[in-house]
Structure formats: C-alpha cells, structure tokens
C-alpha cells in the first residue's frame, strides 16, 4: 500500500532485483581482495559456480574469519585458500581471542568443501581461550592440508584451548 492507502493502479508497480554471478577461478589476496574476510564476504554474497582458489601473498594477516554456508559449493565446486608460494612459512593468519564466544582464528560454521593449504594459523591469546580452528554448524568436507597450527601458550586441557575443535558429528574432516 503506497503511502498507507490502497494502490489504485497495480499496473505501474515495479520491483528491482540485483543478481550476482557466482565466483569461479583464481583470485589473489591482497590484490583482488584486501583481506581473507573481504574474500569470505564476496563468497557469501555471490556463492560459487565452479572451483575457487584464493592465493594468499606472503605476509601476516591479523584477522578472525568465520565461514558460514556458501551457496553453490559441492565436490565439483570447491573453495581453497592457499599460500601463493606454496611455502607454509610464508603466510601467517593470526588473531588474539579473548573469550569463549570468539575462541578461534578460523571457524567453519556451516561451510562445506573448503580447504586451507600451506599456511600457518596461530591464536596469540595468552590465557585460556586459544582455539585455532573451530569446525561446527554442520560443516562438511573441511580440509586442513600441510598447515602449521599453534594455539595459545596457556597450559590447560580445556575445551577452549584446542588446535582444532570439532563440534557435532560427521564433518568429513581431513
């Protein structure tokens, strides 16, 4: 109802829709996307329509990344984040967590068919909450390949201080 009254002429009504094509191909961080979070945001916005590879340039990336479900992913349309050089020592993704709600550097909360390869991931927290990777939310087929993981330095056997924390079942983790 325009202006709170019945529409006298429905023939002139319009609707606008913006459609985004799914991502496919190889992209560079930070050339095409400044951060891993920026790449994740575009994945969530556009989805994928083929294999997507993000080559991460040598450097340190201080950020925390949460991957929800992404439209279009499958065994034939996967997502890979990898060191551009192929050298694990060249890329460091780090974050300092501060509580149970953010106890991760990389989190998969519904993401499927996603791989991290040849990178270092470190939680720089110095107290209790030090998970590095958290997998949950019905995430499936998550692969961590040739990665170096380091949790916080606090000595505990707590649930909140694991290099890889998996919640739920049947994740297809490798």
Predicted regions and their residues:
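Extracellular/luminal regions of secreted and cell-surface proteins that mediate adhesion/ECM remodeling
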Residues: 1-22
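Acidic Gly/Asp/Thr-rich repetitive segments characteristic of extracellular carbohydrate-active
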Residues: 23-62, 66
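Loop/turn elements at helix/coil->beta-strand transitions in domains of secreted/extracellular proteins
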Residues: 49-52, 77, 117, 140
